[in-house]
Amino acid sequence: MDLVALKFIAIGLAVFGMLGAGLGIANIFSAMLNGIARNPESEGKMKSYVYIGAAMVEIMGLLAFVLAMLLIFAA
């Protein structure tokens, strides 16, 4: 197989990291809304933990994006 073709396959596989980040953030906020619906008094405490968790998941998506950009332009 050509080296350029392998490069584009690797870029396509790196995009799955961004897909995982999107699904992870959706799952986090869905669980938060379910928790607030069950116990509205815990909203303030939940928000801080949810934002920290969402930031960690988003960092993984951004790292996948940076990896894809590095593969496109540097490799």
UniProtKB/Swiss-Prot annotation:
This protein's UniProt keywords: ATP synthesis, Cell inner membrane, Cell membrane, CF(0), Hydrogen ion transport, Ion transport, Lipid-binding, Membrane, Transmembrane, Transmembrane helix, Transport
Record has Nucleus as a keyword: no
Pfam families hit by this protein: ATP-synt_C (PF00137)
GO cellular component, one term: plasma membrane
UniProt GO MF annotations: lipid binding; proton-transporting ATP synthase activity, rotational mechanism
Membrane topology: Multi-pass membrane protein
Main location as per UniProt: membrane
Site description Reversibly protonated during proton transport, residues in chain: 58
Alphabetized InterPro entries for the sequence: ATP_synth_csu_bac/chlpt, ATP_synth_F0_csu, ATP_synth_F0_csu_DDCD_BS, ATP_synth_F0_csu_sf, ATPase_proteolipid_c-like_dom, F/V-ATP_Csub_sf
Localization of this protein: Cell inner membrane
Superkingdom of origin: Bacteria
Chain ranges passing through the membrane: 8-28, 52-72
PROSITE patterns, A to Z: ATPASE_C (PS00605)
Presence of keyword Transcription regulation: no
Binding partners and assembly: F-type ATPases have 2 components, F(1) - the catalytic core - and F(0) - the membrane proton channel. F(1) has five subunits: alpha(3), beta(3), gamma(1), delta(1), epsilon(1). F(0) has three main subunits: a(1), b(2) and c(10-14). The alpha and beta chains form an alternating ring which encloses part of the gamma chain. F(1) is attached to F(0) by a central stalk formed by the gamma and epsilon chains, while a peripheral stalk is formed by the delta and b chains.
Function text: F(1)F(0) ATP synthase produces ATP from ADP in the presence of a proton or sodium gradient. F-type ATPases consist of two structural domains, F(1) containing the extramembraneous catalytic core and F(0) containing the membrane proton channel, linked together by a central stalk and a peripheral stalk. During catalysis, ATP synthesis in the catalytic domain of F(1) is coupled via a rotary mechanism of the central stalk subunits to proton translocation.
Entries under NCBIfam families matching the protein: ATP_synt_c (TIGR01260), PRK07558.1 (NF005733)
Family affiliation: Belongs to the ATPase C chain family.
Name of protein: ATP synthase subunit c
Organism: Wolbachia sp. subsp. Drosophila simulans (strain wRi)
